[in-house]
Amino acid sequence: MTHINIKEILWKLHIDSLTAMQQTTVEEYRKGKDLVLLSPTGSGKTIAYLLPLVQSLKNENVLQAVVLVPSRELALQIEQVFKSMGTGIPVMSCYGGRPAMDEHRTMKSLNPQVIIG
């Protein structure tokens, strides 16, 4: 597994502390539990599931996770948050409305560990 420093990620995201939901999610992930998050928009769900996701990735340059979302805008937003975490883990978003060959080229050159689509 990749060593991820949560405090460093929070500092990069300009977050002083985790919300109760985010803290519970991190704790339950460490216990090996499956999680379902139900919470209003803007409550921090993205960070709540991205922190355990990045902690679960191995130090291998292969695709390890796919995050499925209902819209292009949300895919781009999550990709941006992921990159802002500053982990150095390669991530890309894939969505309709752009040439498939462009995505294929990007995927081959980037070799993402995480795809958001």
Positions of the model-derived regions?
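The conserved Walker
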Residues: S39-S43
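Conserved pre-motif I regulatory segment
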Residues: M1-L38
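Generic leucine side-chain signal with a strong bias for well-ordered alpha-helical environments
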Residues: L35-L38, L50-L51, L68, L74
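Walker A/P-loop NTP-binding motif
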Residues: Q23-L35, K45-E60, V81-M85
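Conserved nucleic-acid-binding Ia/Ib motif block in the N-terminal RecA-like helicase ATPase lobe
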Residues: H3-E8, V62-G117
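Gly/Ser/Thr-rich beta-alpha loop segments that engage phosphate groups in nucleotides
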Residues: G44-T46, R98-P99
